[in-house]
């Protein structure tokens, strides 16, 4: 090995095993063009068949017999893919002749019949009996166990194994029937590299693969390249295709001299294999192998049915629980509480060691404390803000290299509410387990005539490995259940939002008519009360103040409803003396709250085209905010200036300091800070939210500056925009 020629697994994983350029020697191969002209033939054709098939020639009846020519004519004149087989006598031997077409090339394979017709008929009848028998199984484990026993009894192989692929493409021997003197491989695991991806594809395309003698000498196909395309002949569907020398060496290291594999294909994927091994050469006749092809299809169908039944039962149970959970959530006043039910809630929906519900700033862990790990997961998911489902079975454990690690290796998370940060998490603990590998799962470097290459391991004695850092993987069924729940909850939240919107519209109607009209009547009645009586005057003032406060609250709610429903605020800009307007608002505030110290610096003659009522609403809101949230007894500074192209109204007050989170949420409605403020128990926390909307309706904005425990709100309106007199 040198720095110039690095050695990788490419020798195995990138090996073009579908174009080996050779076949196994127990048969012969002829490839033909679409008009029947010979393109190439295996080098043993004359020795096996007694004639030469030279490129450019045509097969004759004297060479292959009338049955073969009729079969070939059928393929050459047909449309689409073609495959067929016949038996014919050539010289002293009976041959099975197998034909197929692939990529515009026609292939004829000649294989000597090694068994008499009676034996084949008996075998076929026996195979049919077993096919009928295996269909009675109701679980996969008993099916595989029974089939391995029957296959060994029928074929006489020394060992038959049922080999099932796992989620990581490694395989495990899950059933075995063997000669008593052979070591058992049952329960052993084999790495994915033992059967690389291109080999798995061929197992799907060609479900029966036979090696009659592992120690065979490959018979080359001549010429190696198709003279029509200058490409190698693709032997993917050839029954005689030569096998990878790495695979032959692998079998030799196991002590195997002959093998046959029968694929189990489920849902278009290689689910498993029946692998047959013999310690001496063994050739199974082609007609018998064709019975196994039917057997492969039947077993694949049964496994698929059983797996689908198992998954269907899991989905049935989970669907019942999911629908019950959805009903409880739909009927509950508190969605968070319905989801966080400890007994039959989300933790019972998917097999897990614990769960967590997060919604609107509230979190609840079930069967443990998972809040910190959930926070770490969300922090990682910030890199992909559009992702609504996440899963892993190897979340890192806490360490110096991974400070955001968690106690659970398995994490499955779904987001069902974006605005309220609604998430559900399922967690699985680390699963420390021992794997019994069939030999140490590695390949060794050897130097051969073609340079460095990787060779398979030489020992298949059980080698144990302790695997850490992984949980039980989340299955496709788990993910499907989680996704269905996510969609259910999203629909529930949308329906809830629609209902809230309908109620808001009704509230707007009530506030706008049924409540506002009586308030106006109360105000008018208060104004008509006699002003000569001191008691009456005080009563009138109380009634006026209370009704005015209620009207302001009603107006704020109406404004917010319009904003959140997308209607927007209406502004009617007119030429306005802003200086006079601000003085008036300051004066009204000073009268209403005599304990509030207000200092002013108002430039005279500041005019703008604004909606005076809306502008006054913003000014009053900013002063009210300063009174409620500023330090008691400290003055509030109000300034009005024209700065270039902007009219700027600033309200400054001292405060006890605000966190970054509080600053970020200043303009959000219904803030917790407003609800907890004892000096503003009647407020809704929507004044700044509406003020910002009014500023934006004037094509302006409200800036905030907070430093050294002093906060300044500045309403900025563009003069040019204002001078146009436009409205929005």
UniProtKB/Swiss-Prot annotation:
Superkingdom field: Bacteria
CDD domains: HisKA
Region (Chromophore binding domain): 17-495
Binding residue positions for a tetrapyrrole: 12
Keyword annotations of the record: ATP-binding, Chromophore, Kinase, Nucleotide-binding, Phosphoprotein, Photoreceptor protein, Receptor, Sensory transduction, Transferase
Organism of provenance: Pseudomonas aeruginosa (strain ATCC 15692 / DSM 22644 / CIP 104116 / JCM 14847 / LMG 12228 / 1C / PRS 101 / PAO1)
SMART domains the UniProt entry points to: GAF, HATPase_c, HisKA
Modified residues (Phosphohistidine): 513
GO MF terms held by the record: ATP binding; identical protein binding; phosphorelay response regulator activity; phosphorelay sensor kinase activity; photoreceptor activity; protein kinase activator activity
Broad enzyme group: transferase
Function: Photoreceptor which exists in two forms that are reversibly interconvertible by light: the R form that absorbs maximally in the red region of the spectrum and the FR form that absorbs maximally in the far-red region.
Protein name (database record): Bacteriophytochrome
Keyword set includes Cytoplasm: no
Stretches of the chain forming a coiled coil according to its record: none
Protein EC: 2.7.13.3
Keyword Cytoplasm: no
A single BP term in Gene Ontology: osmosensory signaling via phosphorelay pathway
PROSITE patterns: HIS_KIN (PS50109), PHYTOCHROME_2 (PS50046)
Gene: bphP
